[in-house]
């Protein structure tokens, strides 16, 4: 897809994608069939270049940017952000709310299946380290999609470099997913679950340690968090 050039007037007409479209790096707006993320004004050109430098991988579950977005200028066009596909399905917040109100029937087994059969294998294959993963960034439809892709670590074998996350650490990211599973457990049909919650948590920690080369401190934080959870 070609780069996108918008006038100042056109940029002011863009509609936010949600009630809370802003993050550390920018704000997301609807544009045609996708989303434009416009950088915050306080970001320097170096910050923008650093963010964009690793947005060059393709994955079936990660919504990578497809085009750069420029604001038209009289003398020079200015880089303002990037364009990416729109995530399909419900994010985990919307899914949880539908479960709580009885509008959707999702079992704990289905969540486990999505995690084990689709989520982890694809991340391992692409060698992606999660960055700012939380309920608002994980979408479920027929597939699982991840947004906020400027917050990942990507191993690039071609140049033997790991591009670092701009946000967050592993333990923060995984904790958000734990919180979702735990807070919603009473609404899931757990009678047919093959794995207990304790086993699920242990396996997640073990799998994350395989996917990432994270430090001992990060894994210790995960284990300390596990011990602090009350399962009853």
Q: PLM features: residue spans?
A:
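Conserved alphaE helix
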Residues: 107-124
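Regulatory N- and C-terminal appendages and interdomain linkers associated
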Residues: 1-10, 41-48, 212-232
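Protein kinase-like catalytic core scaffold
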Residues: 34, 61, 82, 145-148
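Conserved structural core of kinase catalytic domains
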Residues: 62-112
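C-lobe/activation-segment region of protein kinase-like
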Residues: 141-232
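Conserved hydrophobic "DFG−1" position in protein kinase catalytic cores
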Residues: 30, 86, 139-141
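Catalytic-loop of the protein kinase fold
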Residues: 120-141
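ATP-binding glycine-rich loop module of kinase domains
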Residues: 11-75
């Amino acid at each position: 897809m070609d780069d996108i050039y918008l006038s100042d007037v056109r940029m002011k007409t863009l509609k936010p994608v949600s009630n809370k479209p802003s993050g550390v790096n920018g704000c997301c707006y609807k544009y045609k069939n996708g989303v434009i993320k416009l950088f915050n004004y306080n970001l320097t050109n170096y910050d923008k270049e650093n963010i964009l430098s690793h947005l060059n991988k393709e994955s079936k579950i990660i919504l990578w940017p497809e085009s750069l977005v420029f604001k038209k200028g009289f003398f020079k066009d200015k880089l303002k952000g990037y364009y990416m596909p729109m995530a399909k399905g419900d994010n985990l917040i919307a899914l949880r709310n539908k479960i709580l109100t009885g509008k959707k029937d999702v079992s704990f087994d289905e969540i486990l299946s999505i995690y084990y059969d689709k989520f982890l294998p694809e991340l391992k294959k692409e060698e992606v380290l999660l960055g700012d993963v939380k309920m608002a960034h994980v979408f479920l439809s027929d597939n699982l999609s991840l947004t906020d892709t400027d917050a990942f670590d990507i191993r690039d074998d071609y140049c033997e470099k790991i591009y670092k996350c701009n946000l967050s650490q592993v333990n923060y990211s995984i904790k958000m997913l734990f919180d979702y599973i735990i807070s919603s457990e009473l609404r899931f049909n757990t009678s047919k679950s093959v794995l207990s919650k304790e086993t699920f948590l242990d396996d997640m920690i073990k799998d994350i340690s395989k996917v990432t080369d994270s430090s001992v401190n990060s894994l210790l934080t995960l284990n300390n968090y596990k011990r602090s959870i009350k399962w009853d």
